[in-house]
Structure formats: structure tokens, C-alpha cells
């Protein structure tokens, strides 16, 4: 249907906006226009009613028979509806074109539109048009009205018949029945009117029913809308609650997700800890097995040591028993010698004046010569007995001869008593070996028993001394005590050849001895006594007492624990202390530190250090600088000034030296010291050389490696700050690995050490157990991986001194080196930053130390990681 066929149009929009019903029009006005439009529409309906009445009057005046009267149309309620219907369709007729006449329109409606569509709200006659626009009406009631079908043709026909009957006046006077309002009441209604009224009543009833239904529908729709609104409100509240619950659930899900991630991380951490614990447990089991094996070895060693001690104690007991027997035999021989001496003195006492006269004379006549010869016979015959006599007097507490005899040189030879029987160079051999010599005179004077006693006693004494000299030397205290006793007896024999004022057994013997010495001189001379030169074998030897031997043995046990300075002071106490303090067995560990020494002093020590196995020179200083001597001249004059004395020490120690330490001796001991050690001490096992002025180079390392192949511990890191920091380089590390593949402990350092040299060192030294890095560049995880890839599988101790290291590098070392038992990190802020006093450097250094300290909380690091921070943080 086109828009012009619709019955209602909008008064605001015009003809182009038409509607099927008033409810649609009202809805359009309410939503498209303001409420004023509804008021205008109600007024327009009233005007339309007036216009319809005027149009009906005009049609009646024109003479159209079918046009009803306006009064009748307005008086009858149905007519009003018809007039309103005609006015409602007026716009439609105007839009379609002018109609020829009113009757044609009615005829058209009567024949072509028997039924007309009226709105339900216009059906009741008592409901005016103004009530349609009342503001009190519910909008839903106005929009929900429906159309009612009415038979318009029948109604118009009946209406026209009624109008014609009313318009024809009856004969007689007076106005007709339809002339006025007063004439209509007495007239009886016609059947058509009755039928019309009945139909109109039925239409009203039907319309009212429709309206009631519409009102119920409106109320129902309102209730439904209210219920829907309430339900929507409840649904919105429920939706908001659900949204809040959803947000809470989302947050809870996020929290659970985070907790899940934390639990997964914790689980992974626990798994890693379990792995580390398993590895640690395995390593502990392996260590336990090693410890058990080591314990079994130690137990075997203890058993062997106990057996050795028992055997040594048995040998010592037997040696003491033999020594006691030997001393008792010596005492018995001394007694016999005294008795023989008394016999000889009594035999010589018959002619004392002649002997003294011949001894004091200076002529070279025959009797003068024979006199000294006879005196020499008596002296030679009493040589051995006089020795024992001196021993007895020296051992007695009353004489104190051992304390009055001056100390002799300890380097004297170990000669035996046979030297007393040899002739002096000044004397002729005919006096001792000829027919009138010593042997024949002794036999003629003393008899056969006395003649055989002197050779027998001298032979026994010589055999005893040889047995002591051939005794094997050990480094134990028991063996060293024996060395002291042996050397004490031999040295006392040489020391007994002191001044001539040593007390003699008796005045009867002194005279013949002195006269013999004087007469033995080829140049002759006066009768006054003259001293024999020190160390001359013509003097009688002294045998020390057992008490002195025990005292020297006790001193030796004590002096082995004294340092070098104390030993030098102890040698100035007395002869016995001097003897023990300068015995080579005491100077096994030589330590010189914090002192000013010269080369001559070291050369003097060399004569006592023949058995030294450890030599330590630390922080030694040369002579003081002169007032007029410049620093350059002083440095040139003192450079290597102790190397000559060190060479004497090394030459004296020889193959006995096992440990050599030279540290903090700048300029006075250079790297030439290691070259000297390689020449003289080829049995070295531990070498330490640290210098700030002359660090070792690859040439010196090559020389040391060529001469000393048994070194297992090497400490050659330069001191910091070093005057030649690049001298110790990767080439030195490579040379160390080639020279000593069985190295166990090593200390290197310096700016010249790089990852290449460390990797080569780790590859060659597969048995390395202790590694110390001093002032090396930063050790990162990459450097640690490169070094551990080549070796260090058996490393037990890692020391990083002033060497920056990252926590990951330490973790890598701990994971690769299974036998690692200790990691020592000594760091300072100056090792990381050039400006340690700046706040940023201090803060970064504190963070680094905190990270390193955090490693101690990891499993396996708490007991092996030791961090030492210089100055604290």
C-alpha cells in the first residue's frame, strides 16, 4: 500500500507521513515531536467536527438528496462518527484530487467500501475527540487500540431514510416532527432507528469490550513490564555479582598461577638440591672410602713405627750397655795406667837431677842427645796412661778441667789415638824405630806385661772410636743424640790440645813431659817450657765423662727447636753449649728473617749447614745507605750482594737441601738465586721465590727445571706492586707445565697470566692439588670452563688472592672439581675499581661481596668457601 492510501497523516510532517491508525500516529507524535503536538491534534479534531457540520449544511442547501442534515448528523451519535470519518478522509481526497460531488462520494462509499475501518477509541458516542488527547491516559493504552469494522453502507442507507422521513412535513398546522427539538420527542421511533440504535449499541458494547480487553492487555503489559524490569534489575544485580565473583575468581586464578610457578620453581630448586645432595653424598662416600683406606695405611704405619721404636729402643739399650762396659773398661785401664805411671815415675826419680840437667842443657853432644832420648822413652811409654789420668781428673768436680780448657775448632779431623805413636817431623825416626828407641827401652824398663799393655789399650780405643764413626746417621732424635756424643768425644780430644797450663796428673810426670818437649826441638834452646801448637797430635787426648755426654745429648734435644738467632747466642755460653750449638745436626732448618745480614755472615753459616734440609730467607735487608751515597749508587752497590754467601750455603748443603724459600728480599737476591740452586741443590722438592724487583722469567724456570726435577711445590708469584709486571707471562706457565708434570702445589700470578697459560698449565699438571692465583685478571665462568676443560680434576684447594672472581665461576669450579675441599677468596675493593674511595665503587663492591657471601648458603659451599675482605665492607 502506498503512503497516500493510509487514512491518517501527521500534522507536522505533512502528506508524506501517513499512518494506518491513530495509535501509530500518536506513537509517531510522542517519539518524533513534542507533547504540544498532541494538544494541537486534540484542538484540530474539534475544529474538524465544526467543519464537518458546515459541509453537511452546504450539501443540504445544494439539493443533493443523499446528503444528510448537519443537525441530524450532529444529533445522532453515529452521525458524528460518520462526519468525523469524512473529515478524517478529507486529506486523502485532497491528495488524490477533487471529487465531482458529495453524493458521488457517498455512493462510492456505499458501493465500493461497504465496510470502513474506524479506530476503537472513536466508536463510543459518549467519548469525545478531546478525551483522546488527555494527559491522564496511559500511553500503552493509546498505542494498543485496534481497528473496528463497521457496515457503513447499511448505516448510511438507514440514516438517509430517517432523514427523508423527518424532512417531509405531515399535513396540518404546526411544525414538522423534525423541525426542532421539541417536535422529536413525541414522535415514535421508526424501526430503522431502532435497528440503528441497536446496532450502534452492539457496536458500543463490542467497542467497550475491545477497550476492556485493551485495558487488561495494557495492565498485563504494565505488569509484565514491571516484572521484566524487576527481573532485569535482579539480573543486573546478579550480573554485577557474577562479574565481581568472576573478577575475584580471575584474581584467585592469577594468584594460584603465581603460586604454581613458585611451587614449580621450588620443586626445581629442591630437585637441584637433591641432585647436589646426591652428588655430595656420593662424594662423601668416596671420601669415606678414601679416608678408610688412608686410616688403614696410617694404622699400618703406626704398627711399623711402633715396631721400629721397639727395635730402636732395644738397640739403644744394647748400645748403652756396650757404652757402659766400654767406659768401665776405660776406667779400669786408667787405674792400671796410673799404677804404671807411678812405677815409671819411681824408676825415673832415682836420677832427677841428671835428667833435668840434660834437658836444660843446650849443647849438642852425645850425652846431651841421649838424655832427651831417654826422657822421650819414658814419655812415650806413659802416653796412654797419662790420657786416662787426665780424663779422671777432668771428670772430677774438684778440678773442673773441662771448663777451663778453651774451645777448639769444631772442624778438626776425627783422628784416633794411633797418631800419638807417630814420630814428629822434627825428630828422627831412628829414635822410635831403632834398636835404642822407644820400644826397646819400654820393654827393658817395664817388662813383658807392661810392654804389651800400651799397644793393646790403644788398639781397643781406636776400635771403639771407629765403631762410633761408622754408626748410621738418622734424622731422628735418638740417632742425633748419638751423633752429638760421638762428635763430643772426638772434639774434646782436639780441644784437649790447649795451653800448657792444663793441670797434669802429678808433678813427677810434668817434669819429664816438659823436658821431653823442650829437648825435642832441633834448634835446642833454654830450659823454659814452650807451648805446642793447637791441633798438634803430639798432645795427649782427653776422653769426656758420661755426665758430659748426657748433658750434651740433652742440649742437642733442646737446641733442635731453637731458631737461628738463639743458636748464635747459645754458642757464647760455654764450651759445651758452643759445641752443640754449632753442630751441623742442629742446623737442619735455617731461618733468617727481618734482619740486616751480609754475605760474609752467610758464608760463616755455611760451615755449620752441611746437613741443612730447609733454608728460608725472608725480609732480609742489606747494609744501611751512607750519608753521601745516592739511592742509585746504593741500589747498584747492594744489588745481589747476598748471592755470594747464598752460594756458599747452597754449596755446603748440597743434596741435603729439600726446601728453599726466598721472599721479600728485593734487589739483594735476584732470580740468579734459583740458578744457583739448580746447580748445587738438585734434590729440591719445594721452592718459593717471590720478589717485587726481579720476578722469575722463563729462562730461569727452564734452568731450575733442568737441574731440579723432583720439585712438587712451586711458589713463584711476583709480589705486588711489581716493577716488571709482564715478566711472568703465559710462557712461564707453559714452561712450568713442561718441566714439572708431577707438580702438586703451585702459586702463580701477575698481570701477564692469561687463560691460555692457565689452560696449558692445567693440561700438563694433571696431579695438581693446590692452586694459588695472585693478582690475576678477573676469573669469569668462561675462564673457569676453559681451565677446567683441560684439567684440575684432582684439585683440592683453590686460593684466589687479590683476584676478582664471579659467583658463577666458583660454582663451575665446585661442580667440576669433585675433590675440592677449600676455596679461599681474598679480595679488596682496589682489585675491582681504580677509584676505590668513590661511593659508586663502594656500593658495587658491597653488592659483589653480598653475592659471594650468598654462595655460602648453597649446599656444598658452607664448609669449603672462605671469603676474606680487606678492610671490610
Swiss-Prot record:
Residues 85-110, 163-193, 345-540 are annotated as: Disordered. GO terms for cellular component: synapse. The modification Phosphothreonine is found at residue 477. Residues 357-371 have a biased composition (Gly residues). The modification Omega-N-methylarginine is found at residue 358. Residues 179-192 have a biased composition (Low complexity). Substrate-recognition component of the SCF (SKP1-CUL1-F-box protein)-type E3 ubiquitin ligase complex. The modification Phosphoserine is found at residues 476, 760. This is F-box only protein 41. The lineage of its organism: Eukaryota, Metazoa, Chordata, Craniata, Vertebrata. Residues 207-349 form a coiled coil. It holds the Pfam family F-box-like. Directly interacts with SKP1 and CUL1. Residues 85-97, 384-414, 442-456 have a biased composition (Polar residues). Residues 168-178 have a biased composition (Pro residues). Keywords: Coiled coil, Methylation, Phosphoprotein, Ubl conjugation pathway. Residues 548-592 form the F-box domain. It comes from Mus musculus. The keyword tRNA-binding does not apply. One of its GO terms (biological process) is neuron migration. The keyword Phosphoprotein applies. PANTHER family: F-BOX ONLY PROTEIN 41 (PTHR15739:SF4), ZINC FINGER PROTEIN (PTHR15739).
Amino acid at each position: 500500500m502506498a503512503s497516500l492510501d493510509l487514512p491518517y497523516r501527521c500534522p507536522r510532517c505533512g502528506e508524506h507521513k501517513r499512518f494506518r491508525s491513530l495509535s501509530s500516529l500518536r506513537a509517531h507524535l510522542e517519539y518524533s515531536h513534542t507533547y504540544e503536538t498532541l494538544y494541537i491534534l486534540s484542538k484540530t479534531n474539534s475544529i474538524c467536527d465544526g467543519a464537518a457540520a458546515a459541509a453537511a449544511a452546504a450539501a443540504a442547501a445544494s439539493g443533493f438528496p443523499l446528503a444528510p442534515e448537519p443537525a441530524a448528523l450532529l444529533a445522532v451519535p453515529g452521525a458524528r462518527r460518520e462526519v468525523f470519518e469524512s473529515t478524517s478522509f478529507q486529506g486523502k481526497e485532497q491528495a488524490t484530487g477533487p471529487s465531482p460531488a458529495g453524493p458521488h462520494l457517498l455512493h462510492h462509499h456505499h458501493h465500493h467500501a461497504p465496510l470502513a475501518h474506524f479506530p476503537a477509541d472513536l466508536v463510543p458516542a459518549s467519548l469525545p475527540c478531546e478525551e483522546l488527547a488527555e494527559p491522564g491516559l496511559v500511553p500503552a493504552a493509546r498505542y494498543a487500540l485496534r481497528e473496528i469494522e463497521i457496515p457503513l453502507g447499511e448505516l448510511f442507507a438507514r440514516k438517509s431514510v430517517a432523514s427523508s422521513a423527518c424532512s417531509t412535513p405531515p399535513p396540518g398546522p404546526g411544525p414538522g416532527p423534525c423541525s426542532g427539538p421539541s417536535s422529536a420527542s413525541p414522535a415514535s421511533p421508526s424501526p430503522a432507528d431502532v435497528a440503528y440504535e441497536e446496532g450502534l449499541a452492539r457496536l458500543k458494547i463490542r467497542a467497550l469490550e475491545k477497550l476492556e480487553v485493551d485495558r487488561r492487555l495494557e495492565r498485563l503489559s504494565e505488569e509484565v513490564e514491571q516484572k521484566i524490569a524487576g527481573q532485569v534489575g535482579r539480573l543486573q544485580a546478579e550480573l554485577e555479582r557474577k562479574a565481581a565473583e568472576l573478577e575475584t575468581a580471575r584474581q584467585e586464578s592469577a594468584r594460584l598461577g603465581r603460586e604454581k610457578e613458585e611451587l614449580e620453581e621450588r620443586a626445581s630448586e629442591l630437585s637441584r638440591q637433591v641432585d647436589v645432595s646426591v652428588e655430595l653424598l656420593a662424594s662423601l662416600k668416596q671420601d669415606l672410602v678414601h679416608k678408610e683406606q688412608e686410616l688403614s695405611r696410617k694404622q699400618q704405619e703406626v704398627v711399623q713405627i711402633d715396631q721400629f721404636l721397639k727395635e730402636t729402643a732395644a738397640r739403644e739399650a744394647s748400645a748403652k750397655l756396650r757404652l757402659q762396659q766400654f767406659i768401665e773398661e776405660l776406667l779400669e785401664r786408667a787405674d792400671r795406667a796410673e799404677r804404671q805411671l807411678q812405677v815409671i815415675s819411681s824408676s825415673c826419680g832415682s836420677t832427677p837431677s841428671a835428667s833435668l840437667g840434660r834437658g836444660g842443657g843446650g849443647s849438642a853432644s852425645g850425652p846431651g842427645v841421649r838424655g832427651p832420648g831417654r826422657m822421650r822413652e819414658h814419655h812415650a811409654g806413659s802416653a796412654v796412661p797419662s790420657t786416662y789420668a787426665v780424663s779422671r781428673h777432668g771428670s772430677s768436680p774438684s778440678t773442673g778441667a773441662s771448663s777451663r780448657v778453651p774451645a777448639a775448632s769444631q772442624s778438626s779431623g776425627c783422628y784416633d789415638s794411633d797418631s800419638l805413636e807417630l814420630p814428629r817431623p822434627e825428630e828422627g825416626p831412628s829414635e822410635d824405630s831403632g834398636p835404642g828407641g822407644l820400644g826397646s827401652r819400654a820393654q827393658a824398663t817395664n817388662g813383658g806385661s807392661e810392654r804389651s799393655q800400651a799397644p793393646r789399650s790403644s788398639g781397643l780405643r781406636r776400635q771403639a772410636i771407629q765403631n762410633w764413626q761408622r754408626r748410621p746417621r738418622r734424622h731422628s732424635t735418638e740417632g742425633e743424640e748419638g751423633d752429638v756424643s760421638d762428635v763430643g768425644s772426638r772434639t774434646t780430644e782436639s780441644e784437649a790440645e790447649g795451653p800448657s797450663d792444663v793441670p797434669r796428673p802429678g808433678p813427677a810426670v810434668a817434669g819429664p813431659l816438659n823436658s821431653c818437649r823442650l829437648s825435642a826441638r832441633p834448634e835446642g834452646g833454654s830450659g823454659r817450657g814452650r807451648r805446642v801448637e793447637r791441633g798438634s797430635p803430639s798432645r795427649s787426648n782427653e776422653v769426656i765423662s758420661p755426665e758430659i755426654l748426657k748433658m750434651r745429648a740433652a742440649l742437642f734435644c733442646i737446641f733442635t727447636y731453637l731458631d737461628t738467632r738463639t743458636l748464635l747466642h747459645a754458642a757464647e755460653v760455654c764450651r759445651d753449649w758452643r759445641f752443640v750449638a754449632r753442630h751441623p745436626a742442629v742446623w737442619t732448618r735455617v731461618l733468617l728473617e727481618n734482619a740486616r745480614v751480609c754475605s760474609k755472615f752467610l758464608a760463616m753459616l755455611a760451615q755449620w749447614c752441611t746437613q741443612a734440609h730447609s733454608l728460608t730467607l725472608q725480609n732480609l735487608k742489606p747494609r744501611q745507605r751512607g750519608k753521601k751515597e745516592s739511592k742509585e749508587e746504593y741500589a747498584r752497590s747492594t744489588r745481589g750482594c747476598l748471592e755470594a754467601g747464598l752460594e756458599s750455603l747452597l754449596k755446603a748443603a748440597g743434596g741435603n737441601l729439600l726446601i728453599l724459600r726466598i721472599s721479600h728480599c728485593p734487589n739483594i737476591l735476584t732470580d740468579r738465586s734459583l740458578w744457583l740452586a739448580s746447580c748445587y741443590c738438585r734434590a729440591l722438592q719445594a721452592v718459593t721465590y717471590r720478589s717485587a724487583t726481579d720476578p722469575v722469567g722463563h729462562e730461569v724456570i727452564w734452568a731450575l727445571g733442568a737441574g731440579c726435577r723432583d720439585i712438587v711445590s712451586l711458589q713463584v708469584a711476583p709480589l705486588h706492586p711489581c716493577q716488571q709486571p709482564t715478566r711472568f707471562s703465559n710462557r712461564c706457565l707453559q714452561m712450568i707445565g713442561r718441566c714439572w708434570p708431577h707438580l702438586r702445589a703451585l702459586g702463580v700470578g701477575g698481570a701477564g697470566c692469561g687463560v691460555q697459560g692457565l689452560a696449558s698449565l692445567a693440561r700438563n699438571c694433571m696431579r695438581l692439588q693446590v692452586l694459588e692465583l695472585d693478582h690475576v685478571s678477573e676469573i669469569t665462568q668462561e675462564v673457569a670452563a676453559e681451565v677446567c676443560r683441560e684439567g684440575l680434576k684432582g684439585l683440592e684447594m683453590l686460593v684466589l688472592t687479590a683476584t676478582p672472581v664471579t659467583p658463577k665461576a666458583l660454582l663451575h669450579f665446585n661442580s667440576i672439581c669433585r675433590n675440592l675441599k677449600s676455596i679461599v677468596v681474598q679480595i679488596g675493593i682496589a682489585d675491582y675499581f681504580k677509584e676505590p674511595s668513590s661511593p659508586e665503587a663502594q656500593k658495587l663492591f658491597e653488592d659483589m661481596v653480598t653475592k659471594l657471601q650468598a654462595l655460602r648458603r648453597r649446599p656444598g659451599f658452607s664448609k669449603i668457601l672462605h671469603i676474606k675482605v680487606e678492610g671490610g665492607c
